[in-house]
């Protein structure tokens, strides 16, 4: 009987220790935010932009600021190089950006490493074979790194990618979800905002 209780106590202590490790190491109190909801004013943010020069991606020293382009509907997509679903939906976002140039579409990549890694990846990734090259994409690309993660979290991100936020002309969030979207899904969300 004592051996049985000893095993139970050890297992319980292990569960408590694992919970404490997860809590103190993986749940950063600065990152746990209330998040924004549909109908809220979108918080302003600025990210570095990634651009192609002669077909080669790099950081061009420019920035994207959400409210610099107030008066337009904006589609903000958060993705990462390791996210398979993100890469699957990227051609849909590109197709949407080409079809609706009056809508501003930006794909913001978040990585834990240096930003140059993203540009290198975009220059060599296999997706360029499917999409005729990242450089031919019509949407804008941005980057947020370890020091800028508040951009993702301040817009309601938790831990899942891809995430898309749609902001209307007045800066009000009209869509905010962590899920994949295709061209038709983007149309269903954005087109009613263009007809307001």
Regions found by a protein language model. Name each.
Residues 1-55, 175, 195-196:
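N-terminal targeting signals for export/organelle localization
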Residues 46-74:
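A short beta-strand-turn-helix
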Residues 72-74, 78-82, 160:
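Short pre-active-site segment immediately N-terminal to redox-active cysteine/selenocysteine motifs
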Residues 78-95:
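Conserved redox-active cysteine motifs that mediate thiol-disulfide chemistry
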Residues 107-111, 143, 177:
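Residue-level recognition of beta-strand->loop/alpha-helix junctions
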Residues 121-169:
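Short, internal strand/loop/helix patches
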Residues 159-196:
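Thiol-/selenol-based redox modules, centered on thioredoxin-like
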């Amino acid at each position: 009987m004592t051996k049985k209780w000893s095993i139970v106590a050890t297992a319980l202590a292990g569960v408590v220790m694992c919970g404490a490790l997860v809590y103190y190491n993986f749940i950063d109190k600065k990152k746990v935010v209330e998040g924004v909801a549909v109908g809220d004013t979108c918080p302003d943010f600025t990210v570095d932009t990634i651009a192609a020069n002669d077909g080669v991606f790099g950081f061009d020293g420019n920035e994207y600021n959400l409210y610099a382009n107030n008066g337009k509907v904006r589609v903000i997509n958060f993705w990462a190089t390791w996210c398979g679903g993100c890469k699957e939906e990227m051609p849909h976002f590109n197709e949407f950006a080409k079809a609706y140039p009056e809508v501003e579409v930006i794909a913001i990549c978040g990585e834990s490493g240096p930003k140059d890694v993203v540009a290198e990846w975009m220059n060599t990734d296999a997706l360029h074979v499917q999409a005729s090259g990242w450089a031919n994409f019509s949407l804008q690309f941005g980057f947020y790194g370890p020091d800028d993660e508040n951009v993702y979290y301040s817009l309601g991100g938790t831990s899942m990618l891809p995430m898309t936020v749609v902001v209307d002309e007045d800066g009000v969030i009209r869509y905010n979800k962590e899920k994949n979207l295709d061209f038709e899904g983007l149309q269903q969300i954005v087109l009613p905002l263009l007809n307001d």
